[in-house]
Amino acid sequence: MESLFLLVLGNTEISTIPGISVAGATPELTKITPVADAEYLFHEKPLTIDAIPVTPEGHPTPAIITKAAKELADFPIIVIRGGTYLAPLVPHVHISDVVGRDFRKEIALPEFGEIIKRAKLFGEELNKLPIKELVIGESTPGGTTTAQAVLWALGYEARTSSASPNNPQELKERVIMEGFNRAGIEKGQLSEKPLEALRQFGDPMIATVVGLSLGFRKDIVLAGGTQMLAVSAILKALGEDMKRFMIATTRWVVNDRSATFVETAREIGIITYSADLDFSNSKFKGLRDYERGYVKEGVGAGGATWLAVKSGFSPEDVSEKVEELYERLMRMKSLT
């Protein structure tokens, strides 16, 4: 076994701000999205809720990509509860049940130290396994806003992506500036204090992935889009050698003109991989709309595709498997 895939689940109160996150049919349902994503990877459908996580317009969770890659390449997945409202109904490693607070009103993550410590300990244990690398994905609704807040606090002029083609950048920036006013800081003021940026504005997923990365000393693929840029920026500020890290994402994130993924990755100094998935010929509108800027990434979709490609499958194989899984979902839906 060369690679181990970890899926870190996180929640932040930021996802319940209307208009911030479409990683759930309603702002309230974003609280359930991480556990539903994890459950869907192992079952025909989630167990906590009798529905597949979708955007308000009905676009399926990117977990369908991760599940497709897993079914092809059969790599092992360990689910980690970084900090969520609910525990997933699948076997998982418990780091915390802390949910990130609304940073406009209070410090987002006072418990960051304990979360990092526990995740680091788990990373150190994984070091003892005969694996060469970790691939770490995430499911964290609202996480692109916390990530952008952390990046801004660290001094990066970053704009993060969104699961919507209409990136609510103005709303994000307004929310972030309210948080900065509450904390009494300006952009870039915490460039020398990465953990303070995490404490003030972060979420439990970021803290968990930072801890895992500090504990596991071999190669790490950060499987996510702009949220993993925040993780990378913190690790760099903590003095980590960025040569052992790579971000694996999808071409939909890389091509997102409303965000600065490529520029920010370059500024941090981390190499990136972009999964060349293509759903333009899908017979399902829910998948074709990925090509119109919906969803883009999540649940380690890019990293899972990368693992499938490493195992000898093509991005086309993954796309075909996604089609098959979506067809299965549609069939189940029509039977209910």
From Swiss-Prot:
Question: Which InterPro entries does the entry link to?
Answer: Nict_dMeBzImd_PRibTrfase (IPR003200), Nict_dMeBzImd_PRibTrfase_arc (IPR002805), Nict_dMeBzImd_PRibTrfase_sf (IPR036087)
One function term, GO molecular function aspect: nicotinate-nucleotide-dimethylbenzimidazole phosphoribosyltransferase activity
Family per similarity comment: Belongs to the UPF0284 family.
The protein, known as: UPF0284 protein PYRAB00380
Q: Organism, per UniProt?
A: Pyrococcus abyssi (strain GE5 / Orsay)
